[in-house]
Amino acid sequence: MKPEISDDLSRRIFLRGAMGVSLFATSGCEKIEDFLGMEPQEGPVVPPSGEGVDLVSHVLNRLTFGPDPSEYARVKGLGVDDESAVAFFLEEQLSPNEIEDKRTQRAVRRLEAIHAPLGELYEYKEDHLLEQLTRATLIRATRSKRQLFEVMVHFWSDHFNIDISKKECRWLKVADDREVVRKHAMGNFSALLKASALSPAMLWYLDGRENRKSGESEKPNENYARELLELHTLGVGGGYTQKDVMEVARCLSGWTVRGKDRFFKGKVEFHADAHDDGAKVVLGNEIASGGGRKDLDDILEIVGMHPSTARFLGRKLCIRFISDDPSEASIKKVAGTFLSSNGNIKETLRAVFATQEFLQGSRAQKLKRPFEFIVSALRGVRARVSSEMDVVDYLIRMGHAPFQYPTPDGYPDIASPWTGTLLWRWHFAIALARNEVSENIKVEEEVLIEKAGGVDGLAASLLGRNPSIEEKAAIERSGEPLALLMASPGFQWK
């Protein structure tokens, strides 16, 4: 059962209606729709205070796609107190290859298309590839025990965004997800950056394959060079000029993607005769003439470990894990670790999680993006899911379908762009609680309440804190505690 809703909903409804005003303010109502049907109120975006959210719930909300009751209990038992338990959990998640995850791997292994070698991807219809890649993404986010790894896969997928609908990306993005993002998500940034630069999908998406020099008067295609500096490394205001963009484009000329050979279609090749082999100067660094394919390595070394790159990535990681407006102290600490560790992603993450702002000052201050909201709901209520694709319609309506963001900057990671998703979040919460999403997704509300020791326990499990007196009263009046809790402000923020 899929609810109907207008496509032209105001993008301001969500934060005005759900965040600025408590959903629990309505009185005298008996139906859940009455609680959620109030008029949106004007006012600033105000997240919950985060007061009462315990450390384990906070860490699980940030490092995973939302806690499920069994995982919360497991993590609580890892130490003599919450601090030691969280420390153990952090180290556990920073070593994903040591975490047994056979159940998830078996489920993903059945999706044969996403495991196909590069040249064989063209044997599949593009819609089939998108479906299998999306299904694998949802399975991993929902079921995997390697949760931080999956969160970082999403982070890098946005950082090195590729819209799967663009030309050959419809086939090649599958290989990019497998060989670039997932392979290097918790490794070294320099290796990730080079893998992305030589990704067939990226060469198609940002026109790198068209960057060639065939005559003295021909200018290089600068599309990828510009995004490399602006989005992948230094960032806006990172100290580069238009001249640097052109020089980087010259360094990267000559790389292309084979298109005709059946078995090698999609293979990346370097054509020396299409490369600008003259001397270049990038960010004050001289690159000698005659470098050929080595020019790519030289330029990536210059920009990959640049102080501006460290700050740009440090800020993005702090935004992802701490708040939409992280402190300068946190950014500097993370950027410093990035440089001192030579781009080691695990060490950089340790620096993020060691900041006092992460540990103490940011609880319930990050709005869940639609993908995070839906997956956290499925995990939080331990839904039995036999077809993850049945939630994709909701993701499309909320504007957060995987691999379908049209511009290179990737899906935004702050609250304000997601202001138009309130009604669809409500629809999903109600449908999930009532077992109306689809016949392939089932929730047992009474069992959840019983295992939680009552409705208050269920509320504590989903909100990460004990419910307030007002919340308890509203839940009792609604008659549908699970739907109300998942639609409440406390469940929208993490």
Say what each PLM segment does.
Residues M1-I13, S22:
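N-terminal secretory signal peptides
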Residues L36-P47, L130-R140, D176-D177, E227, ...:
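Short amphipathic alpha-helical segments and their helix-coil junctions
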Residues G37-G43, P48-G52, S57-S70, H306, ...:
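Flexible, low-complexity segments enriched for small/polar residues
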Residues P48-I99, L198-M202, G208-S214, Y224-E230, ...:
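Cell-wall polysaccharide-cleaving catalytic domain and substrate-binding groove, primarily
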Residues P69-H159, D163-V174, V180:
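N-terminal accessory alpha/beta regions
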Residues C169-R382:
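Active-site substrate-binding loop specific to GH73 endo-beta-N-acetylglucosaminidase modules
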